[in-house]
């Protein structure tokens, strides 16, 4: 699944958009997922990582 972080397993959350007249329509909030080349067990690999994991330094970037 492309909208899931491979590090922390963050995934989309679901809810409603509520208009002024209180009409509810279903919608989803996606996490900010980026494709990043990282080092996993000494080999570079491409992972889907959320930006909160990138800012926290939970992955090591491959150059």
Curated annotation (Swiss-Prot):
Keywords noted in UniProt? Ribonucleoprotein, Ribosomal protein
Q: Which InterPro entries match?
A: Bacterial_rp_bL28, Ribosomal_bL28, Ribosomal_bL28/bL31-like_sf, Ribosomal_bL28_bact-type, Ribosomal_bL28_sf
A GO term (biological process) for this protein? translation
Q: Which Gene3D superfamilies match?
A: Ribosomal protein L28/L24
Q: Quick one: a GO cellular component term?
A: ribonucleoprotein complex
**Coiled-coil regions listed:** none
Signal peptide boundaries: none
Q: Which GO terms describe its molecular function?
A: structural constituent of ribosome
The family assignment reads: Belongs to the bacterial ribosomal protein bL28 family.
Q: What is this protein called?
A: Large ribosomal subunit protein bL28
Q: Which organism is it from?
A: Beutenbergia cavernae (strain ATCC BAA-8 / DSM 12333 / CCUG 43141 / JCM 11478 / NBRC 16432 / NCIMB 13614 / HKI 0122)
């Amino acid at each position: 699944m492309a909208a899931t972080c491979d590090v922390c397993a963050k995934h989309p959350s679901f809810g409603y958009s509520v208009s002024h007249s209180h009409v509810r329509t279903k919608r989803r909030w996606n996490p900010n997922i980026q494709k990043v080349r990282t080092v996993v067990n000494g080999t570079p690999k491409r992972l889907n990582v959320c930006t909160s994991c990138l800012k926290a330094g939970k992955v090591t970037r491959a150059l």
